[in-house]
Amino acid sequence: MRVGIPTETKNNEFRVAITPAGVAELTRRGHEVLIQAGAGEGSAITDADFKAAGAQLVGTADQVWADADLLLKVKEPIAAEYGRLRHGQILFTFLHLAASRACTDALLDSGTTSIAYETVQTPDGALPLLAPMSEVAGRLAAQVGAYHLMRTQGGRGVLMGGVPGVEPADVVVIGAGTAGYNAARIANGMGATVTVLDINIDKLRQLDAEFCGRIHTRYSSAYELEGAVKRADLVIGAVLVPGAKAPKLVSNSLVAHMKPGAVLVDIAIDQGGCFEGSRPTTYDHPTFAVHDTLFYCVANMPASVPKTSTYALTNATMPYVLELADHGWRAACRSNPALAKGLSTHEGALLSERVATDLGVPFTEPASVLA
């Protein structure tokens, strides 16, 4: 199979969808790998590195898209790429379709067979391709939150860990999944007072046991959430419903009662965001004001640390890439139910029930295209 990797086009997206190790394994198995020249530069992977591993360097994105049977990306296609989508091609990438009717329509209109990293799901409910980026985003959320709490950045002027005689920052994390756990872990390590809210008691129990009570846990009710948000210096939203739009848990009316200069970091922005006032931002302009608070809603947070996130992502994706390349999408999905969970579109049919519900688009059972 011919596998193509174009340069990422999203704002300040420095990751790349394959490493030289992945190229070497694909070519060892007899596959061709086409990589757009310069695709790895943001992750400090040179064209020479890719070429030495067996890749063929291609001058333009158009050529990669046109020639590849299996196209690997990190982030969803942007509007400028919609015209490159085509029938008969497999697209394997993060998609987050519930938050983008335009991208969904482009995939359906083109007939592309698309598989979303974020909805590949093992029988135990784990999300193996989303997890590494959730780890990165969670850890970054505490860091960028601490940075934007500085008065020079528009925040409250609070130091995360405080100093002797002065209290630390009050950090509230909504969601105790992979991203929320990692955000809480880093915030706790920085010396902040951390409270995590979730409706999953088992996750709260795990946090309590691991951190010996140093991280406070609360069952997430409207009452507890309101009280926690009002007193917080930093709120990190880390709520996930796999494949679906994130629920809006923090209203603008609640934000109006927060401390002036409080910071809200919305990790869930890829799925529409879990704060009512959230809208996607970029690294060029990462924040905006809502009432007297500061919202940070960068939709590709792990892109800022590509030397970490490219390798973390490709370590997880490569086993699935090899299955797709070796066997084709249909046979790979038949033999691997986790991969089949990621099926999103095929020949104009929408195969994700949650996306169909959120966007009001007809749903087709994935089993019907796997038969």
Curated annotation (Swiss-Prot):
Binds 1 Mg(2+) ion per subunit. SUPFAM superfamilies: Formate/glycerate dehydrogenase catalytic domain-like, NAD(P)-binding Rossmann-fold domains. This is Alanine dehydrogenase. Keywords: Magnesium, Metal-binding, NAD, Nucleotide-binding, Oxidoreductase, Secreted. The lineage of its organism: Bacteria, Bacillati, Actinomycetota, Actinomycetes, Mycobacteriales. InterPro entries: Ala_DH, Ala_DH/PNT_CS2, AlaDH/PNT_CS1, AlaDH/PNT_N, AlaDH/PNT_NAD(H)-bd, NAD(P)-bd_dom_sf. It catalyses: L-alanine + NAD(+) + H2O = pyruvate + NH4(+) + NADH + H(+). Belongs to the AlaDH/PNT family. The active site is at residues 96, 270. Catalyzes the reversible reductive amination of pyruvate to L-alanine. However, since the physiological environment of M.tuberculosis has a neutral pH, it can be assumed that the enzyme catalyzes exclusively the formation of L-alanine. May play a role in cell wall synthesis as L-alanine is an important constituent of the peptidoglycan layer. Substrate binds at residues 15, 75. GO terms for molecular function: alanine dehydrogenase activity; metal ion binding; nucleotide binding. GO terms for cellular component: extracellular region; plasma membrane. Its cofactor is Mg(2+). Its EC number is 1.4.1.1. CDD domains: L-AlaDH. NAD(+) binds at residues 134, 178-179, 198, 203, 220, 239-240, 267-270, 279, 298-301. Pathway: Amino-acid degradation; L-alanine degradation via dehydrogenase pathway; NH(3) and pyruvate from L-alanine: step 1/1. Homohexamer. Trimer of dimers. Pfam families: AlaDh_PNT_C, AlaDh_PNT_N. It is found in: Secreted. It comes from Mycobacterium tuberculosis (strain CDC 1551 / Oshkosh). GO terms for biological process: L-alanine catabolic process. Its main location: secreted. Mg(2+) binds at residues 323, 327. It comes from the Bacteria.
